[in-house]
Amino acid sequence: MFNLSSSHCYLLYVKPCDMRKSFDSLSGIVSGELGREPTGGEVFVFLHKRRSHIKLLHWERDGFSLYYKRLEKGTFTPPVPAEDGSILWPELVLMLEGIKAEKIVRKPRYCVPEKR
């Protein structure tokens, strides 16, 4: 079941990725190159060299989910990630929908402070 939302942390792998890779190989990239734990609950975003394919790797409570999309025409335009490689949920959605977000300015909104 598709279980992604704004409550997840999304990390963009900035190098081109071979789309023949699946769960184990992508998990190896996450742990080996990104230094992250693949089962940590974050969603890892991988793009093909031509940016016409995208994969999202996500650990759910009982195993990995891999979401894969191939465009028949056009390319994905990835957002510029933060220093830690993260992108926001709205940026991911816009990228998947083919909307360039380079000149969009996000206006400040109230956020409920996190409880610790």
PLM feature spans:
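Polybasic/polar functional segments that serve as interface/processing modules
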Residues: 1-116
